[in-house]
Structures are given as structure tokens and as C-alpha cells.
Amino acid sequence: ADVYITSGYGVGCKLLTVNGNQVTDVYRNTVMKNHHGGVVKLGDYLYGYSDGPGWICQNFKTGEMVWNNKTFGKGAVAFADGRLYAQSESTGEVVLLEPSPEGYKEHGKFILTPQSTIRSQRGKIWTHPVISNGKLYIRDQDLIHCYNIAK
């Protein structure tokens, strides 16, 4: 079984293979330095935000960066129905992305409105987008937004 680990603060990522009592290091690098927004694995690729290069696609097997994009800021990501839902922790911007190793492919975006008035001026939206039964849920402190994303 493969075990992938990632952390922020300059630590980076690591892929291990576990076979019974034997653990083998596959790679360790600083391509994916994900603080707390999570990553999504689809096929042989990982998608998420890495401190420094921004939103990235990483080859799961080799650890190499496939592409990066700094169009919008650090945040969390979720996946449903063939799309990535990425949310900026600072601005409340939500972006719909096509997961592709061919490059950053944006299919729409919006700004979360209204946003919480109790969040401090430097406060962040650290909750992950949640998708269930055709609905996208986004929480900002005391507010929960629900969007119908069913096809």
C-alpha cells in the first residue's frame, strides 16, 4: 500500500510503500508543501495548494511537479463529478477546475457572499468545501452557504 504525507512550513511531501513489515521510501521533496487545505489524488496525479508555487498538479508516482498556477490564493480543495472545487482561504473565492495533468483549466468562479463579519481582519476560511447529494457546502465562521451543483 502507498502512503502519501504532506505538510507545510517548508517540510514538503513523502511517498512510502508499505508491504507487510517493510516500509520503502519512494521519494521525499518539497514540491507539495500543503499546510492544511488538503490534496486530491486522481489517477496518477495529486492536486492541491503548495506554499510557494501555488496550486499544483504533482505526479503521484515520481513526486515531480507537472504544473503550477498562482491565479488565486492558498486554500482548500474537494472533488466531485469530475471537477475540483478550490476555495481561497483569504478572499472567499471559489473556483471550479478541471483536473488535468495538461495544465490549469478553470471552468468558473465566484466570490462567497456574504462573508462573515466576525472573522478578524486577518482571519482565514480554513474549512474545506464539502460536497454531498449534489450540494456544495462552504462554511465561513458563523455562516454556512449551500449551492446546488447537481447536473
Q: Over which residues does each language-model region extend?
A:
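Noncatalytic, solvent-exposed loop/strand surfaces
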Residues: 1-151
